């Protein structure tokens, strides 16, 4: 999605306004049947959790398995933190926003405005962006990067 100014509007338009939750991981056999312990309870994998996308219609999508120390960082929180970094809530433009791999990865870029260099020459305009990236996979850290390279094509 391109060109909306609030984090909420951009996330909604990009279908990235879902929440991610942590769930336990139960062992299943090759046929997909939950394996039960001697008490008849699901056999849980103790050192793993799953990240789960909660969709607007109330359904769930499994995203990844993570360790027990993993803490979910919601897409809205990551984007609002980026807007806080640029000290803006409405005048910086959330340029692009989206998710990859069914929601496992989130990205956004905030247009910080152009910088004119060499005003007596060719007047090159360098676009500046704050890139935001996060993964709900336990492997991709939250990244905030200042860049002059567009993260996605126009």
Indicate where each model-derived feature is located.
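Feature for intrinsically disordered/low-complexity regulatory segments and propeptides
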Residues: 1-81, 90
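Intrinsic disorder/low-complexity polar-acidic segments
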Residues: 80-154
């Amino acid at each position: 999605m391109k060109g909306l100014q609030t984090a909420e509007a951009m996330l909604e338009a990009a279908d990235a306004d879902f929440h991610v939750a942590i769930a336990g991981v139960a062992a299943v056999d090759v046929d997909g049947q939950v394996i039960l312990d001697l008490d008849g309870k699901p056999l849980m994998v103790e050192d793993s959790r799953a990240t789960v996308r909660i969709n607007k219609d109330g359904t769930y999508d499994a995203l990844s398995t993570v360790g027990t120390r993993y803490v979910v960082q919601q897409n809205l929180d990551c984007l609002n933190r980026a807007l806080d970094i640029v000290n803006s809530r409405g005048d910086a433009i959330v340029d692009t926003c989206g998710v990859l791999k069914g929601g496992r990865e989130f990205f956004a870029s905030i247009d910080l405005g152009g910088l004119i260099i060499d005003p007596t020459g060719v007047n090159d305009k360098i676009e500046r962006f704050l890139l935001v990236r996060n993964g709900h996979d336990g492997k991709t850290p939250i990244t905030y990067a200042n860049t002059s390279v567009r993260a996605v094509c126009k």
